């Protein structure tokens, strides 16, 4: 069932993702990364698909910039906040799949599994 949003929410959905993605881009160009891996292991972004990434919530801003435009499929909550996040990361080149523990979680995981089996990169947050 499609979500319905109040006028205030629709305005926020039209504005916030644009501003948030612009802020991520502005901050992202100032970030420097150091890949720390075992010498025999490829860094995560060099791993051929399908692969699963797990990100800590506290690292989402840096991860959104680092892994932008890779077509990574992300499981995102069906809440209003999740809608803001989904629209923001889609502007950065991610694919959003919706589902959470309280709203369509099983369907979200099944869709994430389908994306993985189709050969896509997938991501979850911890």
Place the predicted regions along the sequence by residue.
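Short, basic, glycine/proline-bearing loop/turn elements
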Residues: 23-25, 95-98, 123-126
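Residues forming well-ordered secondary-structure scaffolds
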Residues: 18, 84, 107-111, 117-119
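Short secondary-structure transition/capping segments
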Residues: 13, 81-82, 123-126
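Catalytic core of membrane glycerolipid acyltransferases/transacylases, capturing the structured
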Residues: 50-109
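Conserved Motif II region of HX4D acyltransferases
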Residues: 49-52, 111-126
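Membrane-anchoring hydrophobic helices of lipid-metabolizing enzymes
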Residues: 1-70, 86, 113
């Amino acid at each position: 069932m499609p979500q319905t949003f109040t006028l205030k929410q629709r305005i926020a959905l039209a504005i916030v993702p644009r501003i948030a993605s612009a802020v991520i881009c502005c901050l992202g160009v100032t970030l420097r990364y150091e890949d720390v891996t075992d010498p025999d292991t490829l860094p995560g972004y060099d791993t051929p698909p399908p692969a699963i990434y797990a990100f800590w919530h506290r690292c989402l801003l840096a991860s959104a910039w680092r892994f932008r435009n890779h077509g990574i499929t992300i499981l995102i909550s069906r809440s209003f906040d999740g809608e803001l996040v989904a629209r923001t990361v889609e502007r950065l080149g991610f694919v959003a799949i919706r589902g959470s523990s309280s709203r369509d979680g099983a369907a979200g995981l099944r869709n994430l599994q389908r994306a993985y089996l189709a050969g896509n990169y997938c991501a979850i947050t911890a």
